[in-house]
């Protein structure tokens, strides 16, 4: 993901807000085993980094606005409407007919050969086209998100803690803060939400002990309903669903953004190659090429995150024993660690040009 953003010249504006992750610590409460994955062991400077979502979004919009205004070196013809809402979409003989409205309630109709819908988990494009969803997790869950001031350095360590009360993940932020996501069943999350700040921090301190020293204060928790699904038709001639519109994951291993950026970069490769050969962007071979490249990766990542969520929360003692020893084996056996780290860093599947640091104008090698 970082290399994609670097290649797109977006990284310089984001770097000051990025905090590196140099180690990932995975453990299960009441089990002696644990696993650590470090950047040093993997031969990289960092395993990843944490950037505030609002900052990433604002920089992306800024880059699009500058491109639309002709202020970038890229020779692109871009018309930007932000915000905008898709009102209807239908297929004609020659193209798609898309009606959308702007913030000023202006109605605009366009006729593109290719529609790329990256409009989130509640995608209006997907719903208007009646594309069905396949639920990929049986869990009814919610997530509580907050940021916490800590009394000691987080040492750039991300924690994934599996407990009977849910899965707790912490990410290192700037200035002795951590970002925290607590995933659990709805009843547990509702109970956590009703706690006072002091009681909530005390509950969290019990789970994390004093790895962060004293938990000092937290922002008001935000609650999100969780879903895990994949669209049954992610691509068809002239249409591609991207990001959460195509697949929404449980936030277990922070793979949603990695997956979306990889999808985008592979699709960009396919479009760039089609433009070079004057291939119609609605040609069925393009959508099929995209599906062939990405569906296996989607299935692997969704299976991986759901497996972690469901298996580690099991209270069946033989399974707990297996997981406990599984963490120990992974900590001792380098190939297991390497495989997990590649998943966490998003370095699996087909490598697009952007993922390899090449622009779309450069030749593949």
Regions found by a protein language model. Give the residues of each.
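Glycine-rich FAD cofactor-binding loop and adjacent beta-loop-alpha segment at the N-terminus
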Residues: 1-21
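A general structural signal for well-ordered alpha-helical segments in protein cores
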Residues: 2, 23, 53-57, 61, ...
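Conserved N-terminal helical subregion
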Residues: 14-128, 137-141
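Pyridoxal 5′-phosphate
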Residues: 91, 154, 260
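Conserved FAD-binding catalytic core of PHBH/FMO-like flavoproteins
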Residues: 101-109, 114-221
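FAD/FMN-dependent oxidoreductases across multiple families
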Residues: 190-282
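C-terminal helical "tail/cap" subdomain of flavin- and related membrane-associated enzymes
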Residues: 269-365
């Amino acid at each position: 993901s970082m290399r994609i953003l670097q290649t797109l010249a977006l990284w310089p504006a984001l770097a000051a807000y990025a905090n590196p992750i140099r180690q990932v610590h995975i453990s299960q409460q009441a089990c002696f085993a644990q696993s650590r994955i470090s950047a040093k062991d993997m031969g990289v400077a960092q395993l990843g980094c944490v950037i505030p979502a609002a900052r990433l979004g604002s920089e992306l919009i800024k880059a699009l606005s500058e491109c639309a205004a002709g202020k970038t070196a890229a020779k692109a013809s871009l018309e930007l409407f932000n915000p905008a809402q898709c009102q209807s979409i239908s297929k004609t003989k020659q193209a798609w007919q898309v009606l959308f409205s702007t913030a000023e309630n202006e109605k605009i109709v366009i006729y593109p050969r290719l529609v790329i819908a990256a409009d989130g988990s509640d995608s209006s494009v997907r719903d208007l086209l009646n594309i069905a969803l396949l639920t990929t997790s049986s869990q009814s869950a919610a997530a509580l998100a907050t940021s916490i001031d800590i009394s000691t350095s987080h040492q750039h360590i991300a924690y994934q803690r599996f407990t009977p009360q849910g899965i707790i993940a912490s990410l290192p932020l700037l200035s002795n803060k951590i970002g925290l996501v607590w995933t659990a069943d709805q009843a547990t999350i509702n109970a956590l939400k009703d706690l006072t700040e002091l009681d909530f921090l005390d509950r969290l301190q019990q789970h994390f002990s004093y790895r962060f020293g004293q938990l000092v204060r937290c922002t008001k928790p935000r609650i999100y309903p969780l879903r895990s699904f994949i669209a049954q038709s992610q691509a068809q001639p002239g249409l591609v669903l991207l990001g959460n519109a195509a697949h929404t994951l449980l936030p277990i291993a922070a793979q949603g953004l990695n997956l979306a950026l990889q999808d985008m970069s592979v699709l960009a490769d396919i479009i760039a190659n089609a433009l070079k050969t004057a291939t119609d962007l609605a040609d069925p071979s393009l959508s099929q090429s995209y599906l062939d490249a990405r569906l296996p990766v989607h299935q692997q990542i969704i299976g991986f995150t759901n497996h972690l969520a469901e298996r580690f929360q099991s209270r069946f003692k033989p399974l707990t024993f297996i997981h406990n020893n599984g963490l120990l084996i992974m900590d001792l056996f380098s190939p297991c660690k390497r495989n997990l780290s590649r998943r966490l860093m998003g370095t699996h599947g087909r490598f697009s040009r952007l993922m390899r640091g090449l622009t779309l104008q450069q030749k593949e090698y």
